[in-house]
């Protein structure tokens, strides 16, 4: 089973009733002992779009309200509105009688979309600032044995050498809170579920400036899927900014190799004990 097929199998849902699905999180898509946020986003995306007349979640918003445990859970789906061109609904991820994630999404169908296109966002210059061969596989084993998250190990990810904080000397004065990387799930071209997963694929990019900061939970995530990619390999560019009282925003753009912007995301995350960890 290739990487693409493995991911699709990890999204398996069991229909419990007309509006409820059950699933067991796949440990290959975990951060430590917790399901990865982008993986949960993909699961909720699949549950909702399976019930809507439009198959493509063009805008998704999820609030991570509490920890999702590595055990069976349910997805409770509510359809809010359907129309000719789009539809909307929400999903509650419920585990042990507690809502751990709240998801809402607007869906449409790329096959039938029409309208003007312009104001394109080009691939970033940093992509070509060094040879592709100089990008480094994201692997923290040289930094700390066993520290590479399992969700990172399920795809090919090569990071710009300036952003490989685990494999260079840290310089908070000169390093950016940024990560640029080539991405690919071998075996298929990314669909909307894979793009949901990849929208949260980058570990917190503040680490490129400050080094390892421990657990940095994502509190809210917005993902916009702009179009389906035409190439298997993708390029992602993530940038963090405006740390305030430990909270910061992280913005990501994802392109295919033809230069098409296929997805964007923005998340709000929190550095726990940030004053202590960054200033020490």
Language-model features: where?
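Terminal targeting signals and extreme-terminal segments of soluble enzymes
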Residues: 1-280
């Amino acid at each position: 089973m290739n990487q693409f097929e493995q991911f699709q199998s990890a999204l398996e849902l069991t229909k419990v009733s007309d509006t409820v699905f059950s699933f067991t999180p796949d440990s290959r898509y975990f951060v430590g002992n917790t399901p990865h946020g982008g993986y949960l986003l993909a699961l909720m995306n699949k549950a909702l779009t399976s019930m809507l007349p439009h198959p493509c979640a063009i805008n998704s918003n999820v609030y991570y309200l509490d920890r999702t445990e590595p055990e069976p859970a349910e997805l409770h789906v509510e359809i809010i509105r359907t129309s000719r061109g789009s539809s909307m609904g929400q999903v509650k991820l419920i585990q042990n009688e507690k809502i751990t994630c709240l998801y809402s999404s607007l869906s449409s169908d790329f096959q039938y979309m029409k309208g003007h296109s312009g104001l394109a966002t080009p691939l970033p210059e940093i992509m070509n600032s060094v040879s592709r061969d100089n990008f480094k596989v994201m692997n923290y084993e040289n930094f700390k044995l066993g520290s590479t998250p399992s969700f990172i190990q399920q795809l090919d990810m090569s990071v710009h050498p300036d952003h490989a904080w685990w494999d260079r000397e840290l310089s908070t004065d000169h390093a950016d809170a940024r990560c640029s990387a080539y991405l690919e799930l071998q075996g298929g071209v990314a669909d909307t579920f894979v793009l949901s997963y990849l929208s949260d694929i980058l570990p917190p990019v503040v680490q490129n400036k400050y080094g390892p900061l421990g657990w940095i939970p994502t509190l809210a995530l917005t993902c916009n899927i702009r179009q389906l990619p035409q190439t298997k390999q993708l390029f992602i560019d993530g940038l963090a900014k405006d740390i305030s009282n430990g909270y910061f925003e992280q913005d990501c753009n994802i392109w295919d190799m033809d230069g098409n912007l296929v997805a964007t995301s923005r998340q709000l995350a929190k550095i726990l004990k940030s004053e202590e960890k960054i200033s020490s």
